[in-house]
Amino acid sequence: MTLAEIKAAVDQGLIVHWASPSYRVKRHDAGGYYIAHDSGQAIALTHHDGQTLNGEPFEFFLAT
């Protein structure tokens, strides 16, 4: 998935995972996006440039 596809899916209320179902892309109150693990740890969806994903595009997928 591209960055735009990931953001659009999350904004539509769809569940987007990264690498495994244990990781989920979420949007925080300030409007940014992050990848959260079931354990509670999280990282930003992108690098500081706001464009480069923290992960490969093929690793992101919609929940079934």
Identify the residue ranges that each predicted region occupies.
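Short beta-strand-centered aromatic/proline hotspots
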Residues: 22-32
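Mixed-charge, Lys/Arg-rich low-complexity intrinsically disordered regions
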Residues: 1-11
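Intrinsically disordered, low-complexity, charged/polar segments
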Residues: 41-64
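SH3/SH3-like beta-barrel fold
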Residues: 34-37
